[in-house]
A protein has these predicted regions:
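Long, distal/terminal scaffolding or interaction modules
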Residues: 42-47, 51-72, 81-84, 105-406
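Flexible glycine/proline-rich, aromatic-decorated loop/lid segments
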Residues: 2-43
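Glycine-rich, histidine-containing beta strand-loop boundary motifs that form or position
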Residues: 12-15, 76, 211
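Short glycine/threonine-rich loop-to-helix capping motif typified by GTGT followed
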Residues: 1-5, 85-98
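Sliding clamp-binding short linear motifs
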Residues: 12-15, 19-24, 90-110
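Compact, charge-rich alpha-helical regulatory domains located at protein termini
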Residues: 77-80, 87
Length: 406
């Protein structure tokens, strides 16, 4: 690959095999028989991989590469990058189809290679000096440095990627994970946001998007608030249309997201603390979720809650078909029978209406006693057991305190 021009190489699968992977292709099913890709405690006991195995593997790999380089008369990998003239085609194996292959264009070495370097010698220019975050940071200086409330307005296009990441980085430099005080920085955007809108958004920032968003909205969300709604003049039903892409809230640890419309696949994958309300999702929603709350006011795709080990999801099951779309290996379904869950769901739907003006949320709130009975609560079995044990521990402590006082 180096001779064909590669300068970076991936070893993911081979490294997993060194650690014991037997390629059963069950990584997504939580049934890995050797404990590499599973949350099952019994299966994880079967994992016998050690870091020394990886050290040995890459040491021997590097040694073999050095030996091949020595055979060719070179001392560094850089010396052979792009050197297609060093490649030779195997002799014919007399298979007619193989003889028809013309590899000349693949292994062609340009004339410029004799006078110019054909491997990387200068760092890539990422051109981040003029991205939108630079302007936001400049205008939000009062909020960042002294905590004053600041409101800003921007147009946004799908070429504006990772908006909010550099801003949150500036805040993290000063305040760490604490972020800014509540409701310090309000920024309204209009347009189609690019990928990773609101990535790693820090506490105290509210991004309000009027338009639509691409994939990875709220990636690594760290306490910020993002609300998305269709353009004010749009005439379509928001709850029937997708206005945000795939893999939203990937790895989020905190914060809130309210979307007045549907989202794509893998919504809230690896969410570990954020709150989200959306009006429909694609496949694999809440995949590997470990914490937080997710409310789906609409249809879901298949494989809902696969690998979900923490947090709680509430799904509006108006057609009574949700159990077909839910992966039941690690979760259980129930109606909202206790007042705590009902109050929590009501508050989340109310907040969704306040931030997005959702027509669907308003309809539900106006006839709450009817709609609340159509919701299904999704709770991880192990998570529910831990909560029950914690409640029992608190009850026992309370009884012990009463007995001590008397």
């Amino acid at each position: 690959m180096a001779m064909l021009g590669a300068e970076e190489f991936g070893f993911a699968t081979s490294a997993l095999i060194v650690l014991g992977c037997v390629m059963m292709r069950k990584c997504h099913m939580n049934t890995c028989p050797v404990g590499v890709a599973t949350q099952d405690e019994e299966l994880r006991k079967r994992f016998h991989g050690r870091h020394e195995y990886l050290v040995n593997f890459f040491t021997f790999l590097a040694r073999e590469v050095r030996e091949y380089l020595a055979e060719l008369g070179y001392t560094k990998l850089d010396d052979i990058i792009g050197r297609t003239d060093l490649l030779m085609r195997k002799p014919s194996d007399h298979i007619e189809k193989h003889d028809l292959l013309d590899l000349s264009r693949l292994i062609h070495l340009p004339e410029q290679a004799a006078t110019q370097t054909i491997h990387q010698v200068t760092r890539q220019l990422h051109a981040i000096d003029n991205v939108k975050d630079v302007d936001i940071i400049r205008h939000a200086k009062a909020a960042i440095e002294s905590g004053q409330e600041v409101s800003l307005d921007y147009a946004i296009a799908n070429t504006d990627r990772s908006v909010g990441a550099m801003l949150s980085g500036e805040i993290a430099k000063r305040y760490g994970n604490i972020g800014l005080p509540e409701n310090t920085l309000h920024i309204k955007f209009k347009g189609a946001a690019g990928q990773s809108f609101g990535a790693f958004l820090a506490h105290g920032i509210h991004f309000r998007l009027e338009g639509e968003a691409n994939d990875y909205l709220g990636k690594g969300l760290s306490g910020g608030l993002i609300s998305v709604r269709p353009p004010v003049r749009s005439n379509f039903d928001a709850e029937k249309n997708t206005i945000a892409g795939n893999t939203l809230l990937y790895g989020a640890t905190g914060g809130e997201v309210y979307i007045n419309g549907r989202a794509g696949e893998r919504f809230a994958v690896r969410n570990s603390g954020a709150i989200a309300v959306v009006e429909g999702v694609g496949d694999h929603c809440c995949e590997y979720m470990t914490g937080g709350r997710v409310v789906v006011l609409g249809e879901t795709g298949r494989n809902f809650a696969a690998g979900m080990s923490g947090g709680v999801a509430y799904v509006w099951d108006k057609d009574h078909t949700f159990d077909y779309f839910c992966n039941m290996e690690m979760v259980e379904l129930s109606l909202l029978e206790n007042s705590t869950s009902r109050k929590e769901l009501h508050e989340l739907v109310r907040q969704h209406y306040l931030y997005t003006g959702s027509t669907l949320a308003r309809t539900m709130l106006d006839d709450w006693n009817h709609y609340v009975d159509e919701f299904i609560q999704v709770t991880p079995i192990e998570y529910k057991r831990v909560l029950a044990e914690e409640q029992m521990r608190k009850l026992q402590q309370k009884i012990a305190d009463v007995q001590r006082d008397y």
